[in-house]
Amino acid sequence: MRVAFSILLLVSINLWGAKRNPQPVIEKPFAPLEAARTMQVPEGFKVTLFAGEPDIRQPVGFCIDDRGRLWVAEANNYPDKEGGKRDRIVILEDTDGDGRHDKRIVFYDKLEYVSGVEVGFGGAWVMSIPNFYFIPDADYDGVPDGEPVVLLDGFGTHANSHTIANGFAWGPDGWLYGTHGITNWSLPGKPGTPKTKRRRFEGGAWRYHPVRHEWEAFATGTTNPWGVDWNEYGHAFVSNCVNPHLFHVIQGAHYEPDRNRPTGRFAYERIPTIADHLHFTNTKTIRAGIGTPEEDVAGGGHAHSGTMVYLGDNWPVKYRGDVFMNNIHGRRINHDRLSRNGSGYTASHAPDLMRAADPWFVGVTLAYGPDGGVYVSDFSETGECHHRHNTRKQTGRIYKITYGKPKPWRGDIGKLGSVELAKLQSHPNEWFVRHARRVLQERADSTLGQAAIQSELNHLLASSSDTIQRLRSLWVLHGIGELTAKRLAELLRDPDEHLRAWAIQLLCENKRPSGAVLDEFLRLAKSDESPVIRLYLASAMQRLPLVKRVPVLTALLARAEDATDANLPLMYWYATEPVVAADNKAAVQLLAACKLPKVRQFITRRMATKER
């Protein structure tokens, strides 16, 4: 996504089949209610207007809080990076359950260049470039308890207005995740950190821990990712504004395209998209097909925004676990279906979920709420992504897509008791699961109900036959600090590959696994039959000192069956490269053991390179 994603949409009221002939630009959007009424969705679905101008303008992102309210980031400055403090966060609430907001609070209106908002841990987390802020509001009454606190600065806008840091979403591991475009590389750090102690980040996925206040790159690459979400196994996915459109995000990975990123120059090859298709037709001139019948059939165009893995309980079950993203030029919501492929996934094209008739529709963010319905924000403007001036700042909408008659929900997850929150880990709507997990993490220092929830969750972790239920219990126990290294080590021998995999990741969170754990890693590297386990081991090795990586890497590189996997040879290489660069003896050992042709080539190439 590009933050303005403005689409130079030429008038073709024959929306889906027009030839791309020069036409005058549409000067006005459809009225908000008309725009919702004319959206095409499958039988049984309906689209309603949740909010529109003048109550909302230029919604570049939103999140949903524990009460089901939408906190919306309004990018009034876009694309003027020097426009002053005019961006704001607005809270919208539907108090009577009719599907329309009827209460509006301006939470904060002095932001510089906003691109994301999330709520939790007593306030709002806001990306307002060049700064990443925390705005305290302990009781979430919509009135800040104090001035914004700059957690990090150094986020870039030097190259253009759009490929910037954005987000956010709470991950299953208790970190706050965001995404970042390629051209506006950043040097994030706490205020006052000298440039020499900052690490350049050139785009991809990153995360920030809300308690320890640590920032780290999670994966690098893609072009301009916007939005991150997880499936039920805790595997992350991002959509990409510019071709290709969908990636399975693996910790420590480097993704295509290369684009001469200097910090990844020894990656040599990057992990490709998981999509087996494109949503556009001309790979040499990506805009050439916009508006043609062929492009319409393919999916609408090359630019995407927002990532949602649907895990709600309102839409039909056939949509559960599928990935949805806004298609900017196609004015629609694309739909990809995931299937396992070795250590990762393949994403296949499924019928579009929604098509908008309004030529100003610019979908940005997608998220399902407590009733399982999906909110879609519409930036509502024209122009084609890279424009330097935006005179159409008075519009913006948020729609809601539901199936049948969803049951309205009113409540406050934050006011539930800890035992009730633990029981919500069995809820069919992942919205409740995630919010309850985060609130329990916030209460980790409290003794209130801790013994009871530990008992409940440990019982589910030990005795449930449901992988998803066990993972949910695992993540909560980790978030509240009650998952011991001993228990995680025991899970390395669990019969379920997903429990073994997450045990590997969580044992390496502090980058200090014990010698006994490393021995278990070596056993898994040699003999575990699951490619998912080997993928998690490859990620984990990147978090360890070089000398401690060598035994496990030696075993992984000997797994000849992994040569054709889309992820494993490259992930093995990303963990191996620093060892080869630093230790010639270890490099020789790894080369001798390696049965993967691609990695053998990379080791030899790196050994011949003088630069260290």
Q: Can you describe what each PLM-predicted range is?
A:
Residues 1-8:
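Sec-dependent signal peptide recognition
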Residues 8-17:
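Hydrophobic h-region of N-terminal signal peptides that target proteins for export
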Residues 17-423, 431, 439-441, 484:
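Beta-propeller domains with acidic blade repeats across secreted/periplasmic ectodomains
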Residues 377, 394, 401-612:
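Long, ordered, helix-rich scaffold segments
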